[in-house]
UniProtKB/Swiss-Prot annotation:
InterPro entries: NADH_DH_suC, NADH_quin_OxRdtase_su_C/D-like, NADH_UbQ_OxRdtase_30kDa_su
Cellular localisation: Cell membrane
Protein's name in the database: NADH-quinone oxidoreductase subunit C
Job of this protein: NDH-1 shuttles electrons from NADH, via FMN and iron-sulfur (Fe-S) centers, to quinones in the respiratory chain. The immediate electron acceptor for the enzyme in this species is believed to be a menaquinone. Couples the redox reaction to proton translocation (for every two electrons transferred, four hydrogen ions are translocated across the cytoplasmic membrane), and thus conserves the redox energy in a proton gradient.
Similarity comment: family membership: Belongs to the complex I 30 kDa subunit family.
């Protein structure tokens, strides 16, 4: 059970285990003496939540269903998760712009502000490896929710929300730069942190650690399994 704005509501359902992570950095057989190399940790995502969601969350969900119409709502909202007092609507990626525009414009919703875009890479979430999360805020109603959209590694396309929330401009560029998510419809989807000719996306879980020359003084950072251990 969780508490959402003082009203008891249903928490997340059974966690969905998508991977088992061994070691802190994925390196094996290294000279690591910290003990972190022996860590074994399950990677799990929160499960879907039952009603009542708690607090204003039920009002938001009902208002969105009324504004979209039940058929479009059912085709758009894949799952609802209440976890740590936060409401997350998992949205079918093709429906993201219409859902975001409805959340922004409907008088009962009025989520006028998108606070950014965060990327996450879950290699164990088969067919949904790349996630993009959008925290939204209603200044009118003083409420917060989150949208989340997933795409597979082999088709990393998600519609841009620039036309709905122009503030996502640089955030989508950064998420593209670091995770390789392609935001279709973005007016200028170019790298924003890494050099234009950089190969790969460095915050993905499959991006190699170390072994990249540090050009400004000629040193080299070795991969974790080649690093020297100090006692």
């Amino acid at each position: 059970m969780t508490e959402a704005n003082g009203t008891t509501g249903g928490g997340a359902g059974d966690p969905e285990v998508i991977d088992v992570r061994r070691g802190m950095f994925g390196a094996k057989g290294s000279g690591d003496t910290s003990g972190y190399g022996r860590l074994i940790r399950s990677v799990a995502l929160p499960g879907g939540s039952p009603r009542p969601y708690g607090g204003h969350f039920d009002e938001v969900v009902d208002a969105l269903a009324a504004a979209l119409g039940q058929d479009l709502y059912d085709a758009s909202v894949e799952r609802i998760v209440v976890y740590r007092d936060e409401l997350t609507l998992e949205i079918a990626r093709a429906r993201l712009p219409v859902v975001a525009k409805t959340l922004r414009d409907d008088a009962a919703l009025r989520f006028e502000l998108c606070l950014g875009v965060s990327g996450v890479h879950y290699p164990g979430d088969a067919g949904r490896e790349l996630h993009a999360a959008y925290p939204l805020m209603s200044i009118t109603h003083n409420r917060r929710i989150r949208l989340e959209v997933a795409a597979p590694d082999d088709d990393p396309h998600i519609p841009s929300l620039f036309s709905v929330y122009p503030t996502t401009d640089w955030h989508e560029r950064e998420t593209y730069d670091f995770f390789g998510i392609i935001f279709d419809g973005h007016p200028s989807l170019t790298r924003i942190e890494m050099p234009d000719d950089w190969v790969g996306h460095p915050q993905r879980k499959d991006y190699p650690l170390g072994g990249i020359p540090v050009e400004y003084h000629g040193a080299r950072i070795p991969p974790p399994d080649e690093r020297r251990a100090y006692n």
